[in-house]
Amino acid sequence: MIFHLLFDLDDTLLDSNIESLVPVYFQKLAAHLADVLPPQEMLQELMRSTMAMYRSTRVDQTLEQVFSEQFYPPLGTTQEALAARIEQFYDEVFPTLQPLTRSRPEAVSLVEWALSRGWGVSVATDPLFPRKAILHRLRWAELAPENYPFRLISDFQTFHFAKASVAYFGEFLGHLGWDGESPLLMVGDSIERDVIPARQAGIPVFWLKADGQSSPAAEGIPQGTLSDLKAFLERADVSALKADFSSPAALVAALHAAPALIHHLTRVTPPEKWNRRPAPGEWAFNEILCHLRDVDAEVNLPRVEAVLGGQNPVVAGQNTDPWAEQRHYIEQDGAQAFREFVAARARLVEKLKTISPQEWERPARHTIFGPTHLRELAGFMVEHDRAHFKQARETVSI
C-alpha cells in the first residue's frame, strides 16, 4: 500500500498570506473587466459568488457551476461570452501577483524527499480557484506540476465542496482513487480549513503552525514546522496513519460526497459510453446509476428508518444485482436515474444528520452479518459507494 501525503497549498507549500492575496486578486480581476461592470460592483459580485461556492452543498453542481450561476447573470452576460477575457486574465494578469508570495525551499525539499520514498503527494488546496490559478501558484512555490508528479490537485472545475466542508475530503479521496486502506496524512496551516474538517472526515492530520501558535482544535495531533513534519515522518510508522470513517461525521461526509463523485463522471463521460458494457456480464455506467438509485431508495433508506423506528429489528440482506436485468437498467434514462439517486441520497443524508449520538448506536440484527448497529450499517453504505464509484470510473475509461 502506498502512503499518501495531502498538502495544503497557500501558507503551507507557498508563503502567500492568502487573506491579503485574495483582495488584490479580486481588484485586478475587477479592473480587467471594468468595461463590463464598474469595479466596485464587480468586487461585490465576486465576493458574493465566492461565498456561494464556500457555502455550497450541491452534489450536482461543481463549484465553477455554482460560481457561474451567481456571477454572470447580474453582469448581463454569460460564461461563454467572457471566457476569452477570463482566460486572458489568468494568462497575463494573474501571474503579476507572484511578488506578493514567496516560495518555501524547505517545502520543495520535503516534497522531493517524500517522492523519493515512493510516497504519493497530492495538493489538497481549497478549490475556490480555477485550475490555471492553482497551477500558477504551484509554479510560484517552485513546485511546477510539469516537474512534480502530483497525484491530484483540487480545483473548482472538478470539485463540489470548499475545504471547510467535511465532504471535501471524501470527494478528494474518491478522485485520488484511494482504496480505503492505504495510510495517509493531511498537512495544512488552517485550523478551519485543514485541521477541523480533515479530523472530522477521519483523516490523520499534521498541523503546520508558526511558533507560539496553539489551538484547542489541534490538541493531541502532531504539529509544528515543516522541519518538525519531516522529523515526525522519519520516526513515525506511517503505515499506522490510517483513516477512520467510523464516526458519524465521517460517515455522513462520505455519503454526502459520493453523488458528487458520480456527478463528475456524468459530466466527463460521452453519451455513447453510458450504455456500453465493458465485457459480457458486466454493468454499463447507466446500469450502475440505476443500481445506486434503487439501493438508496429501496434498501438504505428503509433500513435506516427500520433501525430508528424499531427495537433491534431484523435487517434482511438483499441481493440487488439481479435488478439490473429484471428492471432493464440498460434501457433506462441514465441522466434521470442520476437525478433520482441525488434526491434519494439527499433524503438519506438529511435523515442521518439529524439523529443523536445514541441513535447511531441503535442495534439491529442483519441476516448475513449478525448483530450490528446503525453506525456499522452506514459504514456498509460507504463501502458500497466506494466500490461502485471505482467500478464506474473503470467502466467509463474503457
Question: Model-found features: residue ranges?
Answer:
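Active-site neighborhood of HAD-like aspartate-dependent phosphohydrolases
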Residues: M1-R48
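Short, helix-capping/interhelical loops that line the mouth of catalytic, cofactor-
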Residues: A236-A250, E298-F341, I398
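Asp-based, Mg2+/Mn2+-dependent phosphohydrolase catalytic module
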Residues: M1-L5, V108, E112, D126-F129, ...
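Short, acidic loop-to-helix structural element flanking the phosphoryl-transfer center
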Residues: Q61-V66, A81-A84, D91-V123
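Short, contiguous alpha-helical
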Residues: N275-T320, A346-V349, W360-I398
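Helix-loop "lid/cap" segments that line or gate small-molecule binding pockets
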Residues: V24-D35, Q61-T77, W323-A324
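A metal-dependent, Asp-based hydrolase signature
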Residues: Q44-E92
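Acidic/histidine-rich alpha-helical segments that form the ligand environment
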Residues: A258, H263-R267, R303, D321-E361, ...
